[in-house]
């Protein structure tokens, strides 16, 4: 009944004209020699070793090498005890900007010692209860 309604609505000639518009497609055969390769997501990580670099800068110019390590994806521990307080404060500001740019993290782990990490490191725990503000330089 629905077919008759459609025939009367569109006309039988219209339906016959449209029948020739669609061709049957041939089945595409896939090559028999394809192999399904399974690659572990963590396979690249197993071969890479994480690295933490230790620095005790004496000049502001040393910040370039420290920032380069962060940009390469390495964590950095920086001891500022051998620096002038004003220069150390500038260096901390520079490293803070570098860490922010790479979406990393910077934590104080000693009176004048900082840990800077890139995004792929996680810092857990807190040492702030052991640190006292005894006139810190920065």
From Swiss-Prot:
A Pfam family of this chain: SepF
Record InterPro entries: Cell_div_SepF (IPR023052), Cell_div_SepF/SepF-rel (IPR007561), SepF-like_sf (IPR038594)
Keyword Cell cycle carried by entry: yes
GO BP terms in the entry: division septum assembly; FtsZ-dependent cytokinesis
Record-level GO cellular component terms: cytoplasm
Cellular compartment(s): Cytoplasm
Keyword Cell membrane tagged: no
Top-rank taxon: Bacteria
Keywords of this entry: Cell cycle, Cell division, Cytoplasm, Septation
Gene3D superfamilies, A to Z: SepF-like protein
Subunit: Homodimer. Interacts with FtsZ.
Family annotation (HAMAP family): SepF (MF_01197)
Function: Cell division protein that is part of the divisome complex and is recruited early to the Z-ring. Probably stimulates Z-ring formation, perhaps through the cross-linking of FtsZ protofilaments. Its function overlaps with FtsA.
Similarity comment: Belongs to the SepF family.
Stated name of the protein: Cell division protein SepF
